[in-house]
A protein has these predicted regions:
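Positively charged, small/polar-rich N-terminal and surface patches that mediate targeting and assembly
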Residues: 1-125
Length: 125
């Protein structure tokens, strides 16, 4: 199946938080869709270069409204689009157990999304 991936990140974030957001989204994507990570490669002196993604992942600028709207639209197609989000609640936590506990008490409307990653069929992305 022909698949595509995009990330949309809030353009109003500081550069460091934009970089952090894309790193977290990419790591989660690699875990969930391991086949997109290529094999290790070697240069002419046999130095190893670890496998990187085998697909393009364009990163687009958006804002909180656009990210929320795209998230809403993508969630209509759960069998065709994998949605990964990163929000203020996650960024504020010291560890993953704190994230789990806080998320259980949060409403979706209370979250400020920093970025989303959409991976799915070309017709839906």
């Amino acid at each position: 199946m022909d698949r595509k991936c995009v990330m949309i990140v809030d353009k109003n974030l500081p550069l460091g938080l934009i970089a952090n957001t894309t790193a977290i989204l990419g790591t989660a994507l690699g875990k969930l869709e391991g086949e997109i990570v290529g094999t290790d490669v070697y240069d002419m002196k046999e130095h190893i270069h670890r496998g990187i993604v085998t697909i393009s992942i364009p990163v687009f600028k958006g804002d909180e409204f656009l990210i929320r709207e795209l998230l809403k639209q993508a969630n209509y197609y759960p069998n065709e689009v994998l949605v990964i989000d990163f929000c203020d609640l996650a960024q504020s936590c010291r560890d993953y157990s704190e994230y789990i506990d806080k998320m259980k008490l949060a409403s979706e409307a209370s979250l400020k999304y920093f970025g989303i990653c959409l991976y799915g069929t070309r017709t839906r992305i």
